[in-house]
């Protein structure tokens, strides 16, 4: 069967830059699935994406499906014919569905009986006939939150479509996709290269587009070029470019022919906190800031043009003129804001609603202030500084700078606090109160900042759960999942002595009578333990390990983490699987027991050598392990408990648990309950698979 290269390119107007990669990757995944479902043999499926096109190139695509033999078994002979030998309705219906008569059906005989059988040789359809619908289906399944319509057409897509190229080798596959007749015409760069040209063979893509159209269709190649050229441009001016992955992706999605240029701004603007300048450059203008080797912002920036100019100085000058007013605004806001102390903004917080049932930002500030002080006392931080940080925590939201440049919240609070002469750990806490903002983000760096960050997040969790507005599905308007995980990360990774039970109770108490959910504390803790599950799964722990620890519902995050590590290590021991199975057996036996057990194991009632030996081991281990459990040395405890494998195996091999004599039976059940209690001091290992 011959194979050819297949190409599909959808030429559009400018696609959403932040969605470009996901659109292209989804297109490739969808089309690959269509090929596989259709049984079309193929090689590598390569995707291309630029601001005005999505494309796929499939190597070694078969020109048709393979022929196949089809077998459909019908009713059993006993049900296929009546007593007179006439076909039943079931048989006729089956035959009709196969496109034959009952007389034309074959017979299938096995040792289990005899059935009607339909066999047919089905010729594979051509790729040319199959591909148009497969492309249309793949496009229809793209993750597009909002479709648009253009012209008088009823066609919907993420952006208007102008060209559709479908080539199998050198042949155009005729089709109408998204309202456009397929062709071999491709559009080049808007201002460089050829506006339109024809492609003779699918193998010419993307090289022909590069040479004639001045478009780098390979997304990764375009991104790599921007990164390399920007690094070189920064090196030439003695700096390092801030090439954050998210901005690199966005810029790569905005240009077809990247040209990296360097520009500058007035040094006077460096008196403004760097974060505000960077926010303007990266957020508004999509520029790359440049820092010196000491990490200090330089009065330069790197940007990417979408065209080669004979006079690049004009493009540079134009970008400098665009950014200058924004930097001047930041300078004005900074100077204006410093005329007031942060504390002077407190009254205005009363005018901003946090949540209708939970009050204003001033109300939230008062709660955070009290909770941060309480947390500081629990973890050994400076209570006065934590309380002060709580009082000032939301004041920067009322400043001109943060109102205009919203992403500078927190960091501007730090700068203004320093200007006001606040303690350094208070100032730093104002910046770090929102950390961690995302997975892998830095944690607060000092104890006061930890207290404030936890207080802010716990106040939100207690409040929103307290009025019954739990996250539902993907909807989480108050970012409660992120808040919960942030609290857990801080407590675990900073090894803080905090209990979710008392922490949540204190956070809820500060709301007074505003909360309507009587189960708020349990709901918040359950929610946070659920985030533990997600966190540890991401860390590579198995689900059953997590479930074994969750079964004990430990509410101290640092303690939870210690149990997780202990159980994970326990699983590597030779004795683990046998002891997990034994615990499962013990759990099942105890669940079926209906008689009340003894408080202790009575040695005088023990008869068999195996039960006497097991009881002796349990007494020794119980006394030895109490300090281990008290100190959270769970890994050492489980290593010691692994020694129970032999006596437990002996017990189950030689002892009848449900003896006829009641006192012996109850004593043996009590012995097993004591065994289980020891393991449950760490986790429910009966849940391990």
Swiss-Prot record:
> Does this entry carry the keyword Calcium?
no
Catalysed reaction, written as an equation: tRNA(Gly) + glycine + ATP = glycyl-tRNA(Gly) + AMP + diphosphate
* Keywords for this protein: Aminoacyl-tRNA synthetase, ATP-binding, Cytoplasm, Ligase, Nucleotide-binding, Protein biosynthesis
| Gene Ontology cellular-component annotations | cytosol
The answer to keyword Ligase applying to this record is yes
Q: Where in the cell is it found?
A: Cytoplasm
Top-tier EC class: ligase
- According to the UniProt entry, what is the EC number of this protein? 6.1.1.14
One of the entry's Gene Ontology molecular-function terms is: arginine-tRNA ligase activity
**Can you tell me which family this protein belongs to?**
Belongs to the class-II aminoacyl-tRNA synthetase family.
Q: How does it assemble?
A: Tetramer of two alpha and two beta subunits.
Task: Identify this protein by name.
Answer: Glycine--tRNA ligase beta subunit
């Amino acid at each position: 069967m011959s194979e050819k290269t297949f190409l599909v390119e959808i030429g559009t107007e400018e696609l959403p830059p932040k969605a470009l990669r996901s659109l292209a990757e989804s297109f490739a995944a969808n089309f690959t699935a269509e090929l596989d479902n259709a049984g079309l043999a193929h090689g590598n499926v390569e995707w291309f994406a630029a601001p005005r096109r999505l494309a796929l190139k499939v190597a070694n695509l078969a020109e048709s499906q393979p022929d196949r033999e089809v077998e459909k078994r019908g009713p059993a002979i006993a049900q296929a014919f009546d007593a007179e030998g006439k076909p039943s309705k079931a048989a006729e219906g089956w035959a009709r569905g196969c496109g034959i008569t009952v007389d034309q059906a074959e017979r299938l005989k096995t040792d289990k009986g005899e059935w009607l059988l339909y066999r047919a040789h089905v010729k594979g359809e051509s790729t040319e006939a199959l591909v148009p619908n497969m492309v249309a289906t793949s496009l229809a399944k793209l993750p597009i939150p909002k479709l648009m319509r253009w012209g008088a057409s009823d066609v919907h897509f993420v952006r208007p479509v102008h060209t559709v190229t479908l080539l199998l080798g050198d042949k155009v596959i005729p089709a109408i996709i998204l309202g456009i007749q397929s062709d071999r015409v491709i559009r080049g760069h808007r201002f460089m290269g050829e506006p339109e040209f024809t492609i003779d063979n699918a193998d010419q893509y993307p090289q022909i587009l590069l040479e004639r159209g001045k478009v780098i269709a390979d997304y990764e190649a375009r991104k790599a070029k921007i990164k390399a050229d920007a690094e070189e441009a920064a090196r030439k001016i003695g700096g390092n470019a801030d090439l954050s992955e998210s901005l690199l992706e966005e810029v790569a999605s905005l240009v077809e022919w990247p040209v990296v240029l360097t520009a500058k701004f007035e040094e006077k603007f460096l008196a403004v906190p760097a974060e505000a300048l960077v926010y303007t450059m990266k957020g508004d203008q999509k520029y790359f800031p440049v820092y010196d080797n000491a990490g200090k912002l330089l009065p330069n920036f790197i940007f990417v043009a979408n065209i080669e100019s004979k006079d690049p100085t004009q493009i540079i000058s134009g970008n400098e003129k665009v950014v200058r007013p924004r930097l001047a605004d930041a300078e004005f806001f900074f100077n204006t804001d410093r005329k007031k102390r942060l504390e002077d903004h407190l009254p205005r917080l009363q005018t901003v609603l946090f949540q209708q049932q939970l009050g204003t930002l001033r109300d939230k500030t008062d709660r955070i202030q009290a909770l941060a002080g309480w947390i500081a006392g629990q973890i050994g931080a400076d209570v006065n500084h934590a309380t002060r940080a709580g009082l000032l925590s939301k004041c920067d939201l009322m400043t001109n700078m943060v109102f205009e440049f919203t992403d500078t919240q927190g960091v501007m609070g730090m700068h203004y606090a320093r200007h006001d002469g606040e303690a350094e750990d208070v100032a730093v806490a104002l910046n770090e109160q929102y950390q961690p903002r995302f997975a892998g983000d830095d944690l607060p760096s000092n104890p006061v900042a930890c207290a404030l960050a936890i207080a802010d997040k716990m106040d939100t969790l207690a409040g929103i759960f307290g009025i019954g507005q739990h996250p539902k599905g993907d909807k989480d308007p108050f970012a409660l999942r992120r808040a919960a995980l942030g609290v857990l990360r801080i407590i675990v990774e900073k090894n803080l002595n905090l209990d979710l039970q008392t922490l949540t109770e204190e956070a809820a108490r500060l709301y007074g009578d505003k909360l309507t959910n009587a189960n708020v504390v349990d709901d918040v803790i359950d929610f946070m333990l659920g985030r533990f599950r997600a966190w540890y799964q991401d860390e590579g722990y198995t689900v059953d390990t997590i479930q074994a620890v969750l079964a004990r519902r430990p509410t101290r995050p640092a303690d939870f983490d210690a149990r997780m590590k202990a159980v994970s290590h326990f699983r590597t021991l030779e004795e683990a699987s046998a002891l997990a199975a034994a615990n499962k057996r013990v759990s099942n036996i105890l669940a079926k027991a209906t008689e009340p057990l003894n408080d202790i194991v009575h040695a005088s009632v023990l008869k068999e050598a195996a039960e006497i030996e097991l009881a002796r081991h349990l007494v020794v281990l119980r006394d030895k392990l109490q300090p281990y459990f008290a100190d959270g040395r769970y890994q050492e405890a489980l290593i010691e408990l692994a020694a129970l494998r032999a006596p437990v195996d002996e017990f189950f091999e030689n002892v009848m648990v449900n003896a006829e004599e009641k006192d012996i039976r109850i004593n043996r059940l009590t012995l097993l309950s004591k065994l289980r209690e020891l393991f449950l001091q760490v986790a429910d290992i009966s849940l391990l698979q």
